[in-house]
Amino acid sequence: MSLAIVHSRAQIGVEAPVVTVEVHMANGLPSLTLVGLPETAVKESKDRVRSAILNSALQYPARRITLNLAPADLPKDGGRFDLAIALGILAASMQVPALMLDDVECLGELALSGEVRAVKGVLPAALAARKAGRTLIVPRANAEEACLASGLKVIAVDHLLQVVAHLNGHVPIEPYKSDGLLYLNKPYPDLNEVQGQLAAKRALLIAAAGAHNLLFSGPPGTGKTLLASRLPGLLPPLSEQEALEVAAIQSVVSLAPLSHWPHRPFRQPHHSASGPALVGGGSKPQPGEITLAHHGVLFLDELPEFDRKVLEVLREPLESGHIVISRARDRVSFPARFQLVAAMNPCPCGYMGEPSGRCRCTPEQIQRYRNKLSGPLLDRIDLHLTVAREATALSPAQQTGDNTAKTAALVADARERQQRRQGCANAFLDLPGLREYCTLAKVDEGWLESACERLTLSLRAAHRLLKVARTLADLEQTEAIARHHLQEALQYRPAAIN
């Protein structure tokens, strides 16, 4: 009678809780019993593992085998436990030394031939293994991804026989050395390519400098989508911690976390997207668009065309920076600290306010169109701007305004001031931080309170207005928020919603 224990990792949301594979062998009729709340794919591991061991010229024990995946109440799916199960059986049958598995974690799916295949969600498991101080054995196809967790000892393998030879000391495998991830020089469209629209460019600069939410409104063809596509080029690079969080999310949904390293995500879902597609969901909760836009930009074009119920689910993550998906068996929290940029037309036909008088929408149609956007949702958007039509110029003169590089430098300076002062962008300041870093002179405080009363702004809107004023002061490299900062910030608030 013998017992072996091997460590592995499950995948729950973007977390990787530890799973202990316990293998017990006893005399009796040859059988293999798998317990510990395994899903169908894990139950199928029994046949894959048996074939992989036999086809690797190793001995499959003809004994009664009991496999337990602990903790039993943790859901487990996929083929990620195949390698750990195989090594547990080999250790229990004394074909590999069990002591060599004490400080090792294993991930990998086995082919019938014994080859070790790639699995998804390796980066969260690598970060957890580094924290636990263990070595991680992964398929070679996942090794570069696992090395994103700097300081982690990674063993890359192609076949089950390689692992057995390594653990027995016959052919030791050197820790995998990453080739080094190059910072991809992704070309962004230049801000100078947008003709005119100086006010909109100014709003874009403020939004980038303080991570503020932004809503463009205007007739079709005025450059709203064009302007929004320029925002990613203005944002500062991700920090190492932020880049790891983004890559971990992409690893979970199999979006090749190394292909966009380390750029900020830019997500643009279609207006027909459902609620689960936007915020996440499913019987086994998966990340939605707001999580895929974590530390990046979520652009919602044609905002009123989205279903109202879909838009309303954005309220909580816009405030908290995360979303909780609850199901009968699971309750999973996903990160969702994104910057919302939206665009919309002023009416169903899009031409309200045009001098040509093309709009034929009735007041009832316009009201019904705008009612799709609730007051609480619009209240959470810091910058509201109407993008007017510019004079048509098919061959415009050379733009004299700042290009993307110059604007990005201003944004970087402002963000650096914010990080030194409070450790986050202005848009993410909580109430204590707002009171500490957005103080006003008594006369300016009274002026702002009076203005908010006249414009019937909510307290939340007033707080967001203060954050925008703080960003304007940072762009001017001044510590004190002046009256003209408040006046400009007030221009970006709608006097009345709907």
Q: What would you call each of these model-derived segments?
A:
Residues 216-256, 320:
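Walker A/P-loop
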Residues 171-206, 210, 238-290:
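P-loop NTPase nucleotide-binding/switch module
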